[in-house]
Swiss-Prot record:
Name of the featured protein: Glycoprotein hormones alpha chain
Gene3D superfamilies xref list: Cystine-knot cytokines
Glycosylation sites (chain numbering): N79
Protein keywords: Disulfide bond, Glycoprotein, Hormone, Secreted
One GO MF term attached to the UniProt entry: follicle-stimulating hormone activity
Signal peptide (from-to): none
Disulfide bonds: C11-C35, C14-C64, C32-C83, C36-C85, C63-C88
Length: 93
């Protein structure tokens, strides 16, 4: 996907950033932040005909997410040591 200044609309690129709210001086917490890609466009007529609930606008997006996700005692632990643009969590179902 495009990841240039024009498509981000002035938003910083996807990267790790120190989370000041959760971090402690001896234990910094890092979080993936920034923009990747999103766009919206009119839904093509042939696509609307196949939709259960037709919609006029179609959107595509990728979000800035942690590259690594591991399990710890059946609890999801997101290791934010590296970030990349991927499917937005709220689009996964």
């Amino acid at each position: 996907y495009p990841n240039n200044e024009i498509s981000r609309g002035g938003c910083d690129e996807c990267r790790l950033k120190d989370n000041k709210f959760f971090s402690k001086p001896s234990a910094p917490i890092f979080q993936c932040v920034g923009c990747c890609f999103s766009r919206a466009y009119p839904t093509p007529l042939r696509s609307k005909k196949t939709m259960l609930v037709p919609k006029d606008i179609t959107s595509e997006a990728t979000c800035c997410v942690a590259r690594e996700v591991t399990k710890l005692d059946n609890m999801k632990l997101e290791n934010h040591t590296d970030c990349h643009c991927s499917t937005c969590y709220y689009h996964k179902s």
